Amino acid sequence: MIAQGGGSIVNSSSFAFLGDYGGTGYPAGKGAVNSLTLAIAAELKEHRVRANVVCPGARTRLSTGPDYVAHIADLNRRGLLDDVSMQGSLDVAPPDYAAPTYVFLASDLARHLTGQIVAASGGFVGKFPKVTPELIGYRDHHDSPPWTVTELSAMFDGRAD
């Protein structure tokens, strides 16, 4: 792609990368796809190579049946899926609703987009925000000691001054 002056990579992931469902291996693998895509986007942007990833929601044999319904209901009961997400998970559209998102991201219409994690499920299209750390404490390591466990506990509990 570099030799041809650019191009577009569109990878597939899953909402499972959030770690809410799918065991441990599947979410870890999908998180790796997302991280790889973001790294490619950063590394190859100057060469006009774009990389984005789609987390499609589409009805498959794995997203139907009584076991699946029970699993989704359990995730909702445990607070891992809100009511809207649960309903969307139980009434998933066919794959042809996600397909245009792939086509768009591969096209020149999306030439300004790279490093995006996009959700496409039925009529829903969304963009995951970039993950950045929220500062909860800072001290200069040149003239301050390391944080104590008690100080860290207070920061994470929102009690730090």
Task: Report residues per predicted region.
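Short, small/polar-rich loop/turn modules that mediate ligand/substrate recognition or access, typified
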Residues: 45, 50, 113-115
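Conserved beta-strand scaffold in the Rossmann-like NAD(H)/NADP(H)-binding core
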Residues: 53-55, 117
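Short helix-to-coil "ATP-lid" hinge immediately C-terminal to the conserved N-box Asn in the Bergerat
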Residues: 2-3, 111
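Catalytic loop of short-chain dehydrogenase/reductase
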Residues: 2, 10-32, 37-46, 55-91, ...
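C-terminal helical subdomain
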Residues: 75-161
